[in-house]
């Protein structure tokens, strides 16, 4: 009788652990899916299975200083960002870049936070000056980084839209193939998304 009770107790414990484990795996998977879905809701030119992963300003700084991968800085209220992210997704998938680290810079830039200033300092050589003569993150901006070294950046439509009213009009008349070639080279040179710290989680 005691043996039978022990077996029943063991089965119950295993079942409970299985349910907890399944719930954890499902929650983890939902977190990944939610980044993609959330991004596709904010940026309507990407698919629901896009590679964009939300990161904090501190996590982006860590990636830029020590990591490897592709970083995208922008915000959904920017129509030029909306027009750009579809090309980032296309090239990321083509080059097997599974994650594009995303930071919405609107508020930190507006408030000139300490973290924003650090991002500006890291990207200093790749940024343009604003009207006051200070370096500024203009968006959209995509950055390829490997082992904490900036490989290259692209911000083609972030400051000079050459008089075009919309991103669609711009890319219809400008060198879209050239952009794709540049992004493909940048993304390929990152190799793969591997950080030397926890920044790729």
Task: Give residue spans per PLM region.
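N-terminal targeting signals for export/organelle localization
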Residues: 1-51, 192, 200-201
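A short beta-strand-turn-helix
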Residues: 50-68
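Thiol-based oxidoreductase modules, predominantly thioredoxin-like and allied folds used
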Residues: 51-54, 73, 97-121
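Short active-site neighborhood of thiol/selenol oxidoreductases, capturing the structured segment around
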Residues: 64-76, 88
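Loop/turn elements at helix/coil->beta-strand transitions in domains of secreted/extracellular proteins
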Residues: 66-71, 96-99, 139, 146-147
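The canonical Cys-X-X-Cys-His
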Residues: 78-81, 142
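Typically the conserved alpha-helix immediately C-terminal to a functionally engaged Cys/Sec
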Residues: 80-96
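Non-catalytic, surface beta->alpha helical segment in thiol-disulfide oxidoreductase systems
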Residues: 132-201
